[in-house]
């Protein structure tokens, strides 16, 4: 179940638009719960959408291409608590893109089982040319690593394209770059 509009780039991955190797091709179904008109979570619709087959709830922290504000970690934590009160074993995954380092806590501090994002944005400090990250419970990270690579390899491999130096420089600079971006918003 997804609580937001999916990025158009994910429609083929999910199977909204048919594609070889999509989640739908693997038998994964998808339900989307729209936000209320004011951009907040529709708790009644979320409750109705969760059933015995629901294994994962995906929450997009940033507004993406929408006009709503981004969700705060506090709002995400409240939603996760609500979801887990209905189905405690459901995995709550947060697409954390653009949200890293903008608060003193991250979604994993308020109950998210898994957070994912792009290294090209905040965590890469503007220097990482490719990549993404997965963080969370050991089981979630391990399962995702095997889906992203192949059986037997898991998180032991991954593309770096010979740019590890840029990754490490980006990781080092990321908090300062993000702070600068936030400060520039205050002065605009």
Ranges and model annotations:
Residues 4-182:
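Conserved PLP-enzyme active-site core in the AAT-like
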Residues 1-6, 186-188:
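Conserved small/polar residues in nucleotide/adenosyl-binding loops
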């Amino acid at each position: 179940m997804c609580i937001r509009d999916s990025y158009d780039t994910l429609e083929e991955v999910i199977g909204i638009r048919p594609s070889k190797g999509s989640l739908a091709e693997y038998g994964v179904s998808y339900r989307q719960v729209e936000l209320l008109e004011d951009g907040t979570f529709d708790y009644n619709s979320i409750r109705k959408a969760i059933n015995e087959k629901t294994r994962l709830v995906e929450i997009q922290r940033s507004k993406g291409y929408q006009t709503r504000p981004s969700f705060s970690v506090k709002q995400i934590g409240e939603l996760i608590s609500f979801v887990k009160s209905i189905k405690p074993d459901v995995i709550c995954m947060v697409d954390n893109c653009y949200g890293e380092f903008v608060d003193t806590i991250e979604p994993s501090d308020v109950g998210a089982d898994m957070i994912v994002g792009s290294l090209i944005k905040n965590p890469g400090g503007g220097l990482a040319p490719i990549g993404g990250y997965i963080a969370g419970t050991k089981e979630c990270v391990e399962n995702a690593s095997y889906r992203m690579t192949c059986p037997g390899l898991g998180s032991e491999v991954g593309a770096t394209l010979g740019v590890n130096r840029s990754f490490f420089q980006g990781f080092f600079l990321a908090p300062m770059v993000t702070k600068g971006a936030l400060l520039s918003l205050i002065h605009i």
